[in-house]
Amino acid sequence: MRRMLLHLSVLTLSCVWATAMEIPMSTVVKETLTQLSAHRALLTSNETMRLPVPTHKNHQLCIGEIFQGLDILKNQTVRGGTVEMLFQNLSLIKKYIDRQKEKCGEERRRTRQFLDYLQEFLGVMSTEWAMEG
């Protein structure tokens, strides 16, 4: 029990340290991809578990579903060890995305500014989104 508490304390401190040190999110994402590959066998050991998998190919539109599946996976996975750091990193990524979404709040601007934003949005959509049919 002491060992587990010590381990959780270390994980908590590392999470606080990562946030305080403002580790670039790109570094956290790369580390998380590596951890995901390393723990894939453990995470897929429960073949009866069913998780929501978006059919849409534009991942940025399905963030809610992705994190809903992640919560289910987290609750059904044996905790502890290095897999705990994977879930810590995924939690940091979710918090980052939530903070970015807060910037979507509406602000009243002139028509020209709105059209500039719309044009930029459509440009991203035409080059970075997988278009269906």
Swiss-Prot record:
Family indicated by similarity: Belongs to the IL-5 family.
Species of the source: Mus musculus (Mouse)
MF-aspect GO terms: cytokine activity; growth factor activity; interleukin-5 receptor binding
Protein name in the entry: Interleukin-5
The encoding gene: Il5
Entry comment describing in which tissues the protein is expressed: Expressed in lymphoid cells, including spleen, thymus, lymph nodes and peripheral blood mononuclear cells.
Function field: Homodimeric cytokine expressed predominantly by T-lymphocytes and NK cells that plays an important role in the survival, differentiation, and chemotaxis of eosinophils. Also acts on activated and resting B-cells to induce immunoglobulin production, growth, and differentiation. Mechanistically, exerts its biological effects through a receptor composed of IL5RA subunit and the cytokine receptor common subunit beta/CSF2RB.
Disruption phenotype: In IL-5 deletion mice, the intestinal eosinophilia that developed in WT mice during T.spiralis infection was completely abolished, revealing the importance of IL5 for the increased production and recruitment of eosinophils to the gut during infection.
Signal peptide range: 1-20
Main location: secreted
Any one GO CC term of the record: extracellular space
Cell compartments where the protein resides: Secreted
